[in-house]
């Protein structure tokens, strides 16, 4: 059974053709909420969605699979919610607003993720992902909220607009990492007036 550990966004391991065939003797299950990607000699071979695979279905899916070492990357495929710590932002009328935000993300392009984010590491934890996200989201919220008044920020319509602008900006920033932001939601905006 292949699945991503609870605290990991993606893990990588190396195996051989013989080991994979041994796992497939009966069948190999890619767990729900997981995708398996296979790379051989730096070449992307294909991916496996959740489901059960046999030697025949495995080989049919990977037309160019050869003997030798194969790298398997197990990644979360479900939409993953991440709640970020509160961020203090100054509005255009000089009020400090504490903003809590939550975003939902999903793996979009494994090749970009491997090249630009995972790199030589064998794992990329959810904590690593949160650490990468926090400064980008903070900067985007500073920009989008900092150009608004306190009354604007507390308005539901403007809060939705801020979330939309933040999502577009974050997607642009993280597109090169192969990660898609499904939603960026402002949970609360509190200030001491």
Question: How does the language model describe each region?
Answer:
Residues 29-32, 36, 41-190:
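Amphipathic, interface-forming alpha-helical segments with heptad-repeat character
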Residues 1-47:
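N-terminal, positively charged regions that mediate nucleic acid binding
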